[in-house]
Amino acid sequence: VGSEMCIRDRALGANVIVCEVDPLKALEAAMEGYRVMPIAEAAKEGDLFLTVTGDKHVVDVHHILEMKDGAFLANSGHFDWEINVEGLKKHAVEIREIRPNLEEYKLDNGKSVYVFAQGRLVNLVSAEGHPASVMDMSFANQALGIEFLVKNKGKLENKLYTLCLLYTSPSPRDVEE
């Protein structure tokens, strides 16, 4: 999801900075021409912060306090905890609704930041859900998972399986003539 968002944002003219903790994914982002840096550095430069990680507090209070006055934050990841909104509230001297699903947090350091959808999943709370292309991939992955379960009935251990490792591109040796 993150790489697709970067592609679209760059196509719209954004100067995209990628904050990636996985070294391989960070290298891929750099090879695609994106600037890559830790969130602690990016916090000082960015105007709009979009999270798509699924990890807790990837944008934490100390990052937010370093952001420019007027920065925007949105979470499009997997859970409501990517932006530490509860911690942010402790530094807010005033919170006001600008419009539905957009709040201004006036902070005790004199800056203001704007949070979409109260830090919840902005693509679900503020919009009408996922685009059709995302749903197509989600349903295709679910179908592949069901196919795997059916083909391996009675052979599987009671554990989690990673779908992307089960279905890889065939090598030339795998293709029959």
Give the location of each predicted region.
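Conserved active-site and cofactor/substrate-binding residues in soluble primary-metabolism enzymes
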Residues: 21-24, 37, 44, 58, ...
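Rossmann-like adenosine-cofactor binding region
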Residues: 35-111
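Metallocofactor- and cofactor-centric catalytic cores in central/energy metabolism, strongly enriched
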Residues: 15, 41-44, 48, 52-57, ...
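Short, glycine-/Ser/Thr-/acidic-enriched flexible segments
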Residues: 23-24, 55-56, 78-81, 120-122, ...
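Adenosine-phosphate binding glycine-rich loop
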Residues: 85-169, 173
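Single conserved hydrophobic/aromatic residue that forms the stacking wall/gate
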Residues: 1-7, 167-177
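Glycine-rich phosphate/diphosphate-binding loop of Rossmann-like nucleotide-binding domains
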Residues: 3-4, 8-43, 51
